A protein has these predicted regions:
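Conserved PLP-enzyme active-site core in the AAT-like
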Residues: 1-170, 175-191, 199-216
Length: 216
């Protein structure tokens, strides 16, 4: 069996909207594929699109969704949802064979109750997205180019190599993505305004002096 797998939201923080998902569904049908959605940050996509989860999953033809928990407030554990029940046959056995079956599985599953009750999962995602937008706006005001649209909780900031090095010396930890100088900055459910302001202050302290030095 062949399958198409997409990530929602994507690795660069963008979100597949309903029209794009419709187009993907047409291709999936044309080539007789199963459709898997990697939803490690699915909550962030739903928070951005402001639609019911069904609108971007089974109603668009998605067969299997991996719903992320660890990137939205949980200590451990993601959830696999089979909209196509046939694909879920013997899934428990496959989990066991892959080493994904814990002896106290209920302790991994129980936190989902708290995360899904009263839309906590969406509140967490909305907060993370909001912090990301605040950070992106602040960086743009400093003249830092944002390399990809900020549609979830990820910001890809095009710092220079010098700026990247100085930020790390100041204690900020981040990955460089798609080449040197593009910092992958992630905001979470627990990112605070104070943390954003502190990072922006550090960025301002290095962006302006380096820019002045280059002008001279």
């Amino acid at each position: 069996a062949k399958a198409l797998s997409i990530t929602q939201s994507t690795e660069v923080g963008t979100v597949y909207d309903l029209d794009v998902l419709d187009g993907i569904h047409e291709s999936v049908q044309r080539f007789d594929l199963s459709w898997h959605m990697d939803g490690a940050r699915f909550a962030n996509a739903i928070a951005t699109l402001d639609v019911a989860p069904k609108e971007v999953t089974w109603k668009r033809g998605v067969d299997v969704l991996c719903l992320g928990g660890t990137k939205n407030g949980m200590a451990v554990g993601d959830c696999v949802v089979f909209f196509n029940r046939d694909l879920g046959k013997e899934f428990e056995y496959r989990c066991k064979q892959a080493g994904q079956l814990a002896s106290k599985m209920r302790f991994l599953a129980a936190p989902w109750v708290g995360l899904l009750t009263d839309d906590v999962w969406l509140q967490n995602a909305r907060h993370a997205n909001g912090m990301a937008n605040k950070l992106a706006q602040g960086l743009q005001q400093l003249g830092v180019r944002i390399a990809a649209p900020v549609e979830s909780n990820a910001i890809f900031a095009a710092f220079t190599s010098e700026q990247t090095n100085v930020l790390r010396e100041l204690g900020w930890i981040f990955y460089e993505f798609s080449g040197v100088g593009t910092a992958r900055l992630m905001c979470s459910w627990k990112t605070t305004d104070a943390e954003i302001e502190r990072l922006l202050a550090d960025c301002e302290s290095i962006v302006t002096p380096l820019a002045q030095a280059q002008d001279n």
